[in-house]
Amino acid sequence: MGAKRAATAYAWAAFLNKGVTLAFGTDYPVEPVTPFRGLYAAVTRKSENGKQDYFPEQKLTMDQAIAAYTTGSAFAEFEEKEKGKLVPGMMADFVVLDRDVTAASPEKVLAAKVLRTVVGGKTVYEAK
């Protein structure tokens, strides 16, 4: 890729500063379906092992990264009036986690577990 092009790859903070709506997802089936690795990378700009640092000036806050996975992804699907937020009248698609990822360290976010998944207001997964 080269250093010049690498400097503009995944320039999340620069995009937000220009008013761009970020939409995050996973690259499943190439990568694990979990968003926790993406959250970690967005807020630390490091690989999962913490050894590589990719342009730290592009770090996001956890709230910004979560918004990219929720409201941003709904916007990218042209469904921001139907999903992406937990408000009356919108689809209730959400997960219940074993920790508050907005208060946890990025390393603890990597270890988060899904306790329940709700799609359209109905539980479709519950941890044993």
Predicted regions and their residues:
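His/Asp/Glu-enriched, well-ordered alpha-helical/loop segment
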Residues: 1-107, 112-120
